């Protein structure tokens, strides 16, 4: 897909860990189908099961996984995140990590490998492009997914569908 061609789906995702590491954490996402238009959004609260600590980076990765869940195979998706870690891990670093047997440049095991591999596998089923947006800088949709993630982490009710639609309109994602 050419770099200047918008994908059919546009996904915004954000994660939050109230105590990093340790949690609890939350994820939030908004997905827009530009062909219909149609909208899907959600938030999930996460606590540790003892296997992995709840961290900001794990929540950011989980938010993207949740956003990509259920999208039709072969479709193009533009994923927008305020996490440079997510964008760089999935669009740059992953190639070197695979070649080095999932080791970093310093020879250490790649953190969050389970989620990165899951996103890589899902990314192979879809055509995913990742882009970064500055967090807490007034982007309406990023602010909404941030609020979804933080509300989920606190176990509180997050933004409503009307709030999500208002943010999408403010960002000129929908009319």
Curated annotation (Swiss-Prot):
<dbReference type="InterPro" id="IPR002156">
    <property type="entry name" value="RNaseH_domain"/>
</dbReference>
<keyword id="KW-0378">Hydrolase</keyword>
<feature type="binding site">
    <location>
        <position position="14"/>
    </location>
    <ligand>
        <name>Mg(2+) 1</name>
    </ligand>
</feature>
<dbReference type="GO" id="GO:0003676">
    <property type="term" value="F:nucleic acid binding"/>
</dbReference>
<dbReference type="InterPro" id="IPR050092">
    <property type="entry name" value="RNase_H"/>
</dbReference>
<comment type="similarity">
    <text>Belongs to the RNase H family.</text>
</comment>
<keyword id="KW-0255">Endonuclease</keyword>
<keyword id="KW-0479">Metal-binding</keyword>
<dbReference type="GO" id="GO:0000287">
    <property type="term" value="F:magnesium ion binding"/>
</dbReference>
<dbReference type="GO" id="GO:0004523">
    <property type="term" value="F:RNA-DNA hybrid ribonuclease activity"/>
</dbReference>
<comment type="subunit">
    <text>Monomer.</text>
</comment>
<feature type="binding site">
    <location>
        <position position="14"/>
    </location>
    <ligand>
        <name>Mg(2+) 2</name>
    </ligand>
</feature>
<protein>
    <recommendedName>
        <fullName>Ribonuclease H</fullName>
        <ecNumber>3.1.26.4</ecNumber>
    </recommendedName>
</protein>
<feature type="binding site">
    <location>
        <position position="146"/>
    </location>
    <ligand>
        <name>Mg(2+) 2</name>
    </ligand>
</feature>
<keyword id="KW-0460">Magnesium</keyword>
<dbReference type="InterPro" id="IPR012337">
    <property type="entry name" value="RNaseH-like_sf"/>
</dbReference>
<keyword id="KW-0540">Nuclease</keyword>
<keyword id="KW-0963">Cytoplasm</keyword>
<feature type="binding site">
    <location>
        <position position="82"/>
    </location>
    <ligand>
        <name>Mg(2+) 1</name>
    </ligand>
</feature>
<dbReference type="GO" id="GO:0005737">
    <property type="term" value="C:cytoplasm"/>
</dbReference>
<dbReference type="GO" id="GO:0043137">
    <property type="term" value="P:DNA replication, removal of RNA primer"/>
</dbReference>
<feature type="binding site">
    <location>
        <position position="60"/>
    </location>
    <ligand>
        <name>Mg(2+) 1</name>
    </ligand>
</feature>
<dbReference type="InterPro" id="IPR036397">
    <property type="entry name" value="RNaseH_sf"/>
</dbReference>
<dbReference type="InterPro" id="IPR022892">
    <property type="entry name" value="RNaseHI"/>
</dbReference>
<feature type="domain" description="RNase H type-1">
    <location>
        <begin position="5"/>
        <end position="154"/>
    </location>
</feature>
<dbReference type="Pfam" id="PF00075">
    <property type="entry name" value="RNase_H"/>
</dbReference>
<comment type="function">
    <text>Endonuclease that specifically degrades the RNA of RNA-DNA hybrids.</text>
</comment>
């Amino acid at each position: 897909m050419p770099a200047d061609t918008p994908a059919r789906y546009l996904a915004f995702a954000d994660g939050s860990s109230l105590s990093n590491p340790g949690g609890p954490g939350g994820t939030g996402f908004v997905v827009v189908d530009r062909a219909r238009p149609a909208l899907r959004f959600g938030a999930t609260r996460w606590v540790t099961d003892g296997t992995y600590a709840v961290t900001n980076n794990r929540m950011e990765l989980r938010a993207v996984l949740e956003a990509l869940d259920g999208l039709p195979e072969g479709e193009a998706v533009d994923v927008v995140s305020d996490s440079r870690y997510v964008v760089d891990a999935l669009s740059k670093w992953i190639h070197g990590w695979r070649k080095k047997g999932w080791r970093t440049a310093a020879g250490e095991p790649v953190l969050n490998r389970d989620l990165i591999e899951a996103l890589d596998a899902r990314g192979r089923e879809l055509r995913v492009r990742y882009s970064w947006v500055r967090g807490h800088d007034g982007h309406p949709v990023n602010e909404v997914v941030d609020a979804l993630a933080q509300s989920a982490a606190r176990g509180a009710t997050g933004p409503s569908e009307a709030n999500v639609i208002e943010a999408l309109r403010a960002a000129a994602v929908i009319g």
